[in-house]
């Protein structure tokens, strides 16, 4: 039932509303990942391939995933150098290159605020709209089966595929940096880092104090 409903909504968005529909579809894909309902889309893709020989959803999937990677890189740029947040953001970006967005979503883009996630969804929408305008279609499912390159027209489509993904990757980074400068929404990142720093200092002070007490006890025993 969920699959049939999703199939109807996707068909209307992509085929009836053009680039705007593709924007909405791409922007909403990763929220579906958060809820777990995205699994139903695999059946829709299989049906598209069986009936038409092509899969326009794969390109939308691609931009929605790499956009979350862009969000993680945006958080990487905002984090303090050599901090744990910076390491986590970079390590969560890498899986998006092979089609896995969950680490970027939960470890970076939703950690301090919903804004990075929203910026990533908007970036995905921009990439999805471009994919629709460029007419990019896949011949299979999954990240490894994008489009054929046997003739000149599909080689051009491959270039469009890459451009669409670059758009989806860059837009979230730009939006996150601009939003942070204007709204300071990521002040929580700095507060968290300050708290971690204060905790480290406190632990160091306690350790030093314990060592001093131990030294004093040893001196007393010798006396």
What are these regions (language model features)?
Residues 62-127:
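Alpha-helical membrane segments and immediately flanking helix-loop junctions
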Residues 1-7, 22-26, 39-48:
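Transmembrane alpha-helical segments that form the functional core of multipass membrane systems
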